[in-house]
Amino acid sequence: MNNFRWFWFFIKSRINWILWILFLNIILLGVAYIDYEISVESVFYIVILNVGLSILFLLFTFVKEVRLSKHFYEDKEIEEIKHKDLAETPFQQQVIDYLYRHIAAQKEKVVEQQLQIKNHEQTITEFVHDIKTPVTAMKLLIDQENDDQRKRALLFEWSRINEMLDKQLYLTRLETHHRDMYFDYISLKRMVIDEIQVTRHISQAKGIGFELDFKDEQKVYTDVKWCRMMIRQVLSNSLKYSDNSTINLSGYNIEGHVVLKIKDYGRGISKRDLPRIFDRGFTSTTDRNDTASSGMGLYLVQSVKEQLGIEVKVDSIVGKGTTFYFIFPQQNEIIERMSKVTRLSF
């Protein structure tokens, strides 16, 4: 904001005083004009001097008081404003003291809440890691099961438990995921195959197969752990809402970007629900009896995609299936985005 606009705001804030001074000077001229014993010319000179000195006083006051307003406008910290002692009037000092006390109290509350959240996240993380041990042991026991039908049923439920634990772990790490990323060129086909292996017990139990169409040399510049998490959430949704069908996964290039396409032939998503599928906790409005979904999987995808620079698009037709597109960035785009984040952090 330029100085002229600041001066205009200052004048508007002092308009009552300015009008009062002008009113008094007009009264003085009027009295001199009515009373013949008073020299109008002398009074006029006094009025001119009075107005001139008032203008100088306004300019002097503006220069002193505008500094505080500029610091507020520039969102300076209240500690900096108080340290510089910018208050020019007792009223301004009262305002600064009030803001300082209340902002300091709010900051203490924020720090306390952040500590509570951190402790809560640490507790959940430790719980998930602790429960992973018996879950892993359970897998070893299931592998020793001789009854194939019973074994498949147990592996199906074990896979669901393992997936829910992983999802909870990712949700807990979500606030600090930007500090837990390492970008490198990764084989897209390898990541997809690894995630299919993780979900194979669920797909086998539901009679779902996979068709892959990738080039071996097709690589993407990303963080392998968080990218695999995104792929897993979409695959999990496709498996959850499909039966006895096929999921097509393919990779292709378009305008210099690698695109991962995941297409299922499940129940699909209605147009009404499509804009909301990435909202936290959102579940389908078409089947209110469905309790299988927590509404957190695609929320994870939405929360991480920006840090990875991945654009996600969705097409769906109810009763015919859903298609997800992951459009991966180029390396220079990731570096540029990370440099912007670094500059903002300083």
UniProtKB/Swiss-Prot annotation:
InterPro entries tied to this protein: 2-comp_sensor_kinase, HATPase_C_sf, His_kinase_dom, Sig_transdc_His_kin-like_C
Phosphohistidine: residues carrying this PTM: 129
Keywords: Antibiotic resistance, ATP-binding, Cell membrane, Kinase, Membrane, Nucleotide-binding, Phosphoprotein, Transferase, Transmembrane, Transmembrane helix, Two-component regulatory system, Virulence
Residue ranges annotated for the Histidine kinase domain, each copy included: 126-332
GO molecular function: ATP binding; phosphoprotein phosphatase activity; phosphorelay sensor kinase activity
TM stretches of this protein: 15-35, 43-63
Post-translational modification: Autophosphorylated.
Protein's cellular compartments: Cell membrane
Record carries keyword Transferase: yes
Catalytic activity, as annotated: ATP + protein L-histidine = ADP + protein N-phospho-L-histidine
Membrane topology qualifier: Multi-pass membrane protein
GO cellular component, one term: plasma membrane
Function: Member of the two-component regulatory system GraR/GraS involved in resistance against cationic antimicrobial peptides (CAMPs). GraS probably functions as a sensor protein kinase which is autophosphorylated at a histidine residue and transfers its phosphate group to GraR.
Name of the protein described by the UniProt record: Sensor histidine kinase GraS
Taxonomic lineage from the root: Bacteria, Bacillati, Bacillota, Bacilli, Bacillales
